[in-house]
Structures are given as structure tokens and as C-alpha cells.
Amino acid sequence: MVKRHATLLALACFAAVPASTLAAESWMRAQVEALPASVRQVLPCGQWTQASRQGTYRVVEANVNEGAGSELYVQWVTDPLQGDPSRITKTVAFSELNDDHSQYRFESVQCRARGAAIEITVKARYEHDEDDRLRTFNVRVEPGGSYRLDEVGARKRK
């Protein structure tokens, strides 16, 4: 009987401990906790190679103005080499989407590798649209950092 009560007491104590304190500490916990709350998502997307270095493209979506708008970035992150940690070697911003006077609020961001380049599809709402329609943008980012941004279904200007 005493053994049964001891087991129940042990289980009750275990259940009272918050799950977060039971999780094992990780190497990256401090860095992850240091991420700004405005970073909405980070997507790995394809591989790049330049001279003797290689790595992964990283797409970063962030909220601005308390979530009223969104911004998009692509970063080149190196693969770690023999004790040399990963580094961000380049960051590209998209002025067509990241304008705080004409903000877009992203509904979804998807990315896929296309050979050495990447293509990002952004579905967003524009703050000045009266009909609150969903716009779609395709962004092709080349290995050197140049890009082409097109709005799907947009009228061509003369």
C-alpha cells in the first residue's frame, strides 16, 4: 500500500512540473529565443555555390508595424566548414514589397529551387486596395543576388 502511494505521489509531482522545464536544453536555444518576435517564418530554399563556398538560400518573412505589413528577404547562408561556422554572406531585400508607405500584408510565402536560382511566390493584400483583393507575386532570385519580381495578372503599363 505504501509503495502504491509513493508511486502516485511521484506521478503527481512529475505531472506538476511544467513541460518546458522537462525539455532538454539545446545548443541553439539562446539564439532561437533571441530571434525578434517580428520574424514570422524562415524557409530554407535551395542550394548555392560560389567559388569555393556553398550553402543554402534562406527566405525570411517578417512582420512590420505590429503586423500591419510584411517584408521579405533572401539570405545566403554558408555551409559550415571544418570548425568554421555557418555565416550569412549576403542579404537581399525587395523594395517593391518592402515599402513602409505602401505596405503589403503577406498571406503566404512559398519557395522552390529552380536550378541554381530560387523562385518565391508571395500572396499578399495591399493596404491601399479598396476591394482587399489577394495579389500574387513571383520573385526569381539569381545566384549573384539579382532578381526579377512580377505580379501575376497585373496590367502591363504602356
Predicted regions and their residues:
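Bacterial N-terminal signal peptides that target proteins for export
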Residues: 1-9
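Compositionally biased, intrinsically disordered low-complexity segments
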Residues: 5, 17-20, 91
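Exposed acidic/polar residues on beta-strands and adjacent loops within beta-sheet cores, strongest
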Residues: 22-158
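Bacterial N-terminal signal peptides
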Residues: 9-17
